[in-house]
């Protein structure tokens, strides 16, 4: 009788609480969390989507080079943009405020680059995907902007916004994956894992 091959362990190349939570939603608990410390500075004239997929790949490949065991490495990078202008991962109150002002009353796009690498017997199999979600904020008053900034929710978030927090009350329209805006598109993640032989539903 043929025995089912056991799944390889999952390594998440990120310490993002949102990405950990999203994996938990699909009943995947990473065996290790190894944040990849890379330079996330955009290249000259680099566009948002290519930036997101490049950074995701660099994170995944760095972790793959650090481990000796066979595993599946999940890496992602989320970039928010207004047109071709990349919004920063806000680190200060002022950066959050500037980002929120830019998206107030208009549509912006959130891109997540997803890179999943299967490392087995020193062989690497790579799956990559770029996922885009369109988000529109209502026109915000100064009072609303100042209140949101005072919450510190947007610190360290792409575009200065945490979609699963208070900012959700500002969204008038969203087209595409909600989990993508949170930092990990689950539909694409499951598809990529399945294509690599990981049993998502029968474990």
From Swiss-Prot:
Cystine bridges: none
One cellular component (GO) term of this entry: cytoplasm
Reaction catalysed by this enzyme: a ribonucleoside 5'-triphosphate + H2O = a ribonucleoside 5'-phosphate + diphosphate + H(+); a 2'-deoxyribonucleoside 5'-triphosphate + H2O = a 2'-deoxyribonucleoside 5'-phosphate + diphosphate + H(+)
Residues of the active site: 77 (proton acceptor)
GO BP term, pick one: nucleotide metabolic process
EC number: 3.6.1.9
Main location per the UniProt record: cytoplasm
Pfam families linked to this entry: Maf
Protein origin, superkingdom: Bacteria
Keywords carried by this UniProt record: Cytoplasm, Hydrolase, Nucleotide metabolism
Essential cofactor(s): a divalent metal cation
Compartmental location: Cytoplasm
Gene Ontology MF terms: nucleoside triphosphate diphosphatase activity
Similarity comment text for this entry: Belongs to the Maf family.
Main function: Nucleoside triphosphate pyrophosphatase. May have a dual role in cell division arrest and in preventing the incorporation of modified nucleotides into cellular nucleic acids.
Name the record gives this protein: Nucleoside triphosphate pyrophosphatase
């Amino acid at each position: 009788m043929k025995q089912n091959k056991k799944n390889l362990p999952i390594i998440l190349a990120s310490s993002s609480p949102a990405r950990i939570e999203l994996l938990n939603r699909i009943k995947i608990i990473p065996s290790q969390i190894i944040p990849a410390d890379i330079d996330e500075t955009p290249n000259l004239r680099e566009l948002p989507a290519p930036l997101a997929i490049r950074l995701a790949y660099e994170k995944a490949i760095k972790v793959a080079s650090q481990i000796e065991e066979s595993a599946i490495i999940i890496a992602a990078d989320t970039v928010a943009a207004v047109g071709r202008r990349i919004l920063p991962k806000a680190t200060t109150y002022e950066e959050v405020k500037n980002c929120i002002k830019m998206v107030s009353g208009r549509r912006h796009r959130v891109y997540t680059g997803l890179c999943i690498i299967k490392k087995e017997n020193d062989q690497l199999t790579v799956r990559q995907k770029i996922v885009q979600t369109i988000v529109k904020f209502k026109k915000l008053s100064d009072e609303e902007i100042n209140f949101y900034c005072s919450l510190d929710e947007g610190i360290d978030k792409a575009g200065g916004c945490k979609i699963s927090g208070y900012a959700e009350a500002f969204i008038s329209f969203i087209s595409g994956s909600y989990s993508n805006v949170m930092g990990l598109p689950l539909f694409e993640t499951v598809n990529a894992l399945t294509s690599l032989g990981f049993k998502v539903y029968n474990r």
